[in-house]
Amino acid sequence: QKNNWENTFISLYSFSKSYRLTGHRIGAVITKKERLCQIEKFLDSVTICPNQLGQIGALFGLRKSSKWLKNERLKILNKKIQVIKEFENLSNWKLKGCGAYFAYVEHPFSECSSIVTQKLLSKKAILSLPETIFTPTNKKIIKKHIRIAFANINSSQIKEMFKRLKNFQI
């Protein structure tokens, strides 16, 4: 346990993502009171105010949708588990990190990630993003990592994606 963790802890929560309030920026911040006062000063100085419809949607979600939210969370976690298991069976590809929506992967090819992502799209219809989008421009970067989104596909589509990855060659 880190000493004085309360001096650095900030937790952000997005009602917009949880309750699918697309386009509405509704969220919550948890931190110590003194920091929250400073955050409030910042928010007062920028032009950001969630519209009333988004606020009503978030409040409705909090009051009425906990069962639905629990089921959605389980679906997301099951997809994540499936992706992790599928990568265990995919030779030479290394899963570096897996969240609720994306997998961060090291590919087995000698080409850089920008070329690999282009070939994945043109040959296998898999849209992915090269690591160069997420990292600073630095010649020392390996450039062998890609990010694959899986939140918008179902279980059978995840299986199909891994069949395509298994048979993929540059």
Which role does the model predict for each range below?
Residues 1-21, 32:
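Active-site pre-lysine segment of PLP-dependent enzymes
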Residues 4-5, 34-53:
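Active-site C-terminal subdomain of aminotransferase-like
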Residues 5, 122-127, 136-170:
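PLP-dependent enzyme catalytic core of the Aspartate aminotransferase-like
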Residues 9, 27, 58, 76-77, ...:
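Generic structural signal for small/hydrophobic residues in well-ordered secondary structure
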Residues 9, 93, 126:
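Short, conserved active-site loop motifs that form the nucleotide-linked donor/cofactor pocket
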Residues 27-33, 63:
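Short beta-strand-to-turn element immediately C-terminal to the catalytic PLP-Schiff-base lysine
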Residues 39-44, 61-84, 113:
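Structural signature of PLP-dependent enzymes
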Residues 59, 74-84, 94-107, 144:
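Conserved glycine-rich beta-strand-loop-beta hairpin in the small C-terminal domain of fold type I
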